[in-house]
Amino acid sequence: MPVALPVTLYPDEPMARHSSWRAGGTARYYAEPATPDEAIALAAWAREQQLPLIWIGRGTNLLVRDEGFDGVIASYRGQRWELIEHGETAEVWIEAGAPMAGTARRLAAMGWAGLEWAEGLPGAVGGAIVGNAGCYGGSVAEVLITADLLLNGSECVEWSVHDLAYTYRESVLKQLLHTGIPPLVLAGRFRLQRGDPAALTARMKAIAAERKQKTPAGSSCGSVFKNPAGDFAGRLIEAAGLKGVRIGDAEISTLHANYIINRGQARAADILALIDLARTKVADQFGITLQLEVRII
């Protein structure tokens, strides 16, 4: 019996609409489930149609190759959250589709500390959990308690932060992104402490100002490469003489060399060519192999 779909499917969807790079090919089907039941139904439909299924966040570190993806790409959009107070501490349960920075701001305004480092962090909670997002002295691994997951497109489970095996910008979830129907993060439960709303808000405003000053203008997916141990990817790329190098409409930023900017109509191939160039030059000159922080489909 065919699976009834409670979620809208968008055929031949240009994924440039869903990537901060504003570049990339099409997905055969694109969907935005907003509940676990919708995600389960979508996974069942994809299995029935014998189509590969990939879960994504908000596309802030995503590039789909120009030839596109012959399957289903889905972005989970549930955004509910619930705060459970325990005197001077609290736990907040946040669905994966909620914006990381916006949620952190709301909690700070309520006097809850723990996520203020996420000010200006692009993307949603789910992607942050998968990639152990971090900046300005904080990271997901330090405050996450548990994650609610959908495994094999059918089984809802809860994993502890230890189960996720976090390292720098890595998790076991990230390693499983390309295996069968990959795990989907449905929600995360985070640890908070009571703080002064004015002080927390002031800190977040300072972080936002610093981030704005350091972030190149234009369409990008943020840091392209992870920082190697004891060094910075941007410094190495700059030292290799690649600042400002352009292929098509893709450019290695003159402000921060670990950013690749779409200056107009860049193709995924242009961005990938700059990625390969940076990797090759840095490896040749410094003997360091840069590892991607962005996700290529």
UniProtKB/Swiss-Prot annotation:
Family to which the UniProt record says this protein belongs: Belongs to the MurB family.
Coiled coil: none
PROSITE patterns: FAD_PCMH
Taxonomic classification: Bacteria, Bacillati, Chloroflexota, Chloroflexia, Chloroflexales
Protein name from the UniProt record: UDP-N-acetylenolpyruvoylglucosamine reductase
A biological-process GO annotation: regulation of cell shape
InterPro entries: FAD-bd_PCMH (IPR016166), FAD-bd_PCMH-like_sf (IPR036318), FAD-bd_PCMH_sub1 (IPR016167), FAD-bd_PCMH_sub2 (IPR016169), MurB (IPR003170), MurB_C (IPR011601), MurB_C_sf (IPR036635), Oxid_FAD_bind_N (IPR006094)
Active site: R169, S223 (proton donor), E293
Entry GO terms, CC: cytosol
